[in-house]
């Protein structure tokens, strides 16, 4: 009996020791599991941060290299352009208003000291003697419009005729005003006759009629000669 009790006690002690051992093993597993996971998570986070920082550094480095390359390329382009620069050759001044007939009025000198009235932008008055000389020049220019009639260049004929007639009318008015009273009337009649034929010639150019242009050009030439004879 005593022997049986001793064997039962031995079995109980052995089973208790086995149970305690299993508890210790399982307890160590529970403790080691979370400890291992807590250590692993920070390591993974550190790895991710390191990778992000390295990627940003790589992007910045590439951007800087691209900027430097663009700067070098633009600098070389500017140097090439400057190397190929050629001096600009400045020639003589162009003809009056491009040399087109009927546009010389824009090249006439104006008195910039005058106030902003019509006198500043219209033909400036000349003394009677100088006005007579300019009237002769305008009359000779009117005689040269025959070339436009021959070429049937009607716009050029009108432009040149009107320009010269404006000078001639202005200067003849100055000359007539300085003449004695007995000479004014005859010169005014000749002037009126002259500008009547000029107006008819302008109308012939407007309707593009070679026949009428020839007719009124002949009358204009005759009237100009009479006026110039009076001017002396």
From Swiss-Prot:
The keyword Thylakoid applies. It holds the Pfam family PsbQ. One of its GO terms (cellular component) is photosystem II oxygen evolving complex. Keywords: Chloroplast, Membrane, Photosynthesis, Photosystem II, Plastid, Thylakoid, Transit peptide. Residues 1-83 form a transit peptide. Gene3D superfamilies: Oxygen-evolving enhancer protein 3 (PsbQ), four-helix up-down bundle. GO terms for molecular function: calcium ion binding; electron transporter, transferring electrons within the cyclic electron transport pathway of photosynthesis activity. Residues 92-111 are annotated as: Disordered. Coiled coil: none annotated. One of its GO terms (biological process) is photosynthetic electron transport chain. It comes from the Eukaryota. It is found in: Plastid, Chloroplast thylakoid membrane. PANTHER family: OXYGEN-EVOLVING ENHANCER PROTEIN 3-1, CHLOROPLASTIC. This is Oxygen-evolving enhancer protein 3, chloroplastic. It comes from Spinacia oleracea (Spinach). The lineage of its organism: Eukaryota, Viridiplantae, Streptophyta, Embryophyta, Tracheophyta. The gene is PSBQ.
